């Protein structure tokens, strides 16, 4: 009898707890549809289910807000203005949004939870962003760890981007083995030296990342990217390799690939000031886009130079392209500096880190380095070194333009 009574009491307690949870859920968790009002325009309103994030709700309605980190809250790009219904700003957002901006309603769309009706404001250019399923034309090594991915835009479509802009590329769930990569013989030595073929990338969900375009607007019908493989650091070889770069390196001619865009803010200023471009690694992409656009589309007569840093001649690419531009345009010169030239390179050009080379061979004796505009993209250490050098020369922030994607 005591056992039966105990079972009954236990069951009643469980049922009571379930009822409490259901009651709390009915009060705390929103049900039914919610409406997102956009730019005070009824035709732009979005009706969706509660429970997700604002970034996903916008994407589901065909409104693609830039998010280089794929919604993780680390890039700070998916900024929107939430006028009501977004709740309190989260600590994860305060790394990217000042207190003053927060008071104005600035939020990261990837961090805003969908709980109730919401009123938001988006930049008008967002509505020009589209999504395309592209076809891989080619995916060739340009350096030991850099591929040039060339995508064909669907017939009849165009991506209305500006030089220095970027797109977002989607990687589906995948299992990629580095051993399956087709690495040309000239680059295999380093891959084997660092035992890179042992790595795999296994991902169970879709991932989105941003890449700057290497082509310029008059190279119609294509998107061209420079993608550096993101292998684990030598001092921590057991961490997972880069999800997106691993996927991109696995693509072959004829494969399909989904992109969205265009996005961007790393655009050239419309002035007559001298332009100094500084790049390294896959930071070549926006440098090529900008320089080609200035010289081949705009036929600019602005004085400009390009300074590119690489390890050895094996890591130099687009050399013939830039040599041709320099030959055809008296206002353009370019230089490459090798930080670790190989004996077989027989290199007689500049050596060392590019920020030192730029300073020692040009800016130190420049009559007004503070009047130039500096456009740069490269590894974080290069960017920091160049910016530090420019600050020492008295260059103002407004004349230092940085693309953070290309390292």
From Swiss-Prot:
Cofactor binding, note field: Binds 1 [2Fe-2S] cluster.
This enzyme's EC code(s): 7.2.1.1
Catalytic as annotated region, ranges: 272-389
Pfam family membership, one: NAD_binding_1
Binding annotation for [2Fe-2S] cluster: 69, 75, 78, 110
Domain 2Fe-2S ferredoxin-type: 32-126
Main location class: membrane
GO biological process: sodium ion transport
Subcellular location: Cell inner membrane
Top-rank taxon, per record: Bacteria
GO cellular component terms attached to this protein's record: plasma membrane
Domain FAD-binding FR-type residue range list: 129-269
InterPro entries according to UniProt: 2Fe-2S_ferredoxin-like_sf, 2Fe-2S_ferredoxin-type, Beta-grasp_dom_sf, Cbr1-like_FAD-bd_dom, FAD-bd_FR_type, Flavoprot_Pyr_Nucl_cyt_Rdtase, FNR_nucleotide-bd, NqrF
Assembly behavior: Composed of six subunits; NqrA, NqrB, NqrC, NqrD, NqrE and NqrF.
Family: Belongs to the NqrF family.
Protein name stated in the entry: Na(+)-translocating NADH-quinone reductase subunit F
Species: Vibrio campbellii (strain ATCC BAA-1116)
Gene it is expressed from: nqrF
